[in-house]
């Protein structure tokens, strides 16, 4: 009887300790997410625009990748094309994932932009934009661009601009229309975690892009561009 009672007490104490540890970990995780979120919102204040007439003109627009055909992709393409046609960027660097067979975000963006009337000769492809960090840092280290307009949804631009600052890049953002909460809830939740990951990558791990490679000059005299097929 006494042994059974002792086992019950140990079980209760252990359960309470586990619960306390779990609650503490949840509090730490929640605080970390909130801090990372606030840091990136503050870093991008007055550096993003949604009005094509108000955004400053720059030489290169960096269009961040998304799965071809999805709603984020379509809105980013429309926004990048509008920015180009308004004379706010001269060149478009489309950066996306090409790490899987038959999956090529950069070529998909290039073809969609051409369909919107953007000349093929002003589009440059970055096939190694496996993450936002890769896309932003490669824009400087591979394509030699230190003053860029990043094109994506506002939540994405905030993180990209913060990352750009950590790697010494002068970036502003032009915001593509977002989805409503009903359709974009999962993406918004994933973005909160991505902001924590970005802080770890930039501040703790000092991560560099997965691939760098030879330099590519963006401009009329470059031998490189964005062919219809890589």
Curated annotation (Swiss-Prot):
Localization terms from the record: Membrane
Superkingdom of source: Bacteria
Chain ranges passing through the membrane: 18-35
Keyword annotations: Membrane, Transmembrane, Transmembrane helix
InterPro entries the UniProt entry points to: Cell_Envelope_Assoc, DUF218
Topological relation to the membrane, as annotated: Single-pass membrane protein
Coiled-coil blocks: none
Gene Ontology CC terms: plasma membrane
Main location: membrane
Pfam families in the record: DUF218
Similarity comment: family membership: To E.coli SanA.
UniProt-recorded name of the protein: Uncharacterized protein YgjQ
Organism the protein comes from: Escherichia coli (strain K12)
Gene assigned in the entry: ygjQ
């Amino acid at each position: 009887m006494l042994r059974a009672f002792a086992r019950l007490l140990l079980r209760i104490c252990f359960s309470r300790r586990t619960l306390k540890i779990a609650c503490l970990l949840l509090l730490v995780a929640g605080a970390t997410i909130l801090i990372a979120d606030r840091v990136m919102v503050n870093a991008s204040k007055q550096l993003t625009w949604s009005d094509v007439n108000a955004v400053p003109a720059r030489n290169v627009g960096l269009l961040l990748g998304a799965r071809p055909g999805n709603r984020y992709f379509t809105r980013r393409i429309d926004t990048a094309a509008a920015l180009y046609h308004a004379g706010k960027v001269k060149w478009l660097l489309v950066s996306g994932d090409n790490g899987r067979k038959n999956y090529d975000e950069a070529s998909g963006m290039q073809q969609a932009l051409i369909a919107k009337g953007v000349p093929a000769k002003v589009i440059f492809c970055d096939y190694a934009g496996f993450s936002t960090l890769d896309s932003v840092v490669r824009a400087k280290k591979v394509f030699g661009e230190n003053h860029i307009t990043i094109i994506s949804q506002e939540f994405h631009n905030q993180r990209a601009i913060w990352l750009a600052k950590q790697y010494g890049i002068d970036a502003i953002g032009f915001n593509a229309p977002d989805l409503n909460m009903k359709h974009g809830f999962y993406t918004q939740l994933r973005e909160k975690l991505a902001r924590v990951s970005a802080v770890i990558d930039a501040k703790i791990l000092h991560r560099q892009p997965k691939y760098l490679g030879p330099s590519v000059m963006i401009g009329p005299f470059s031998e490189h561009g964005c062919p219809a097929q890589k």
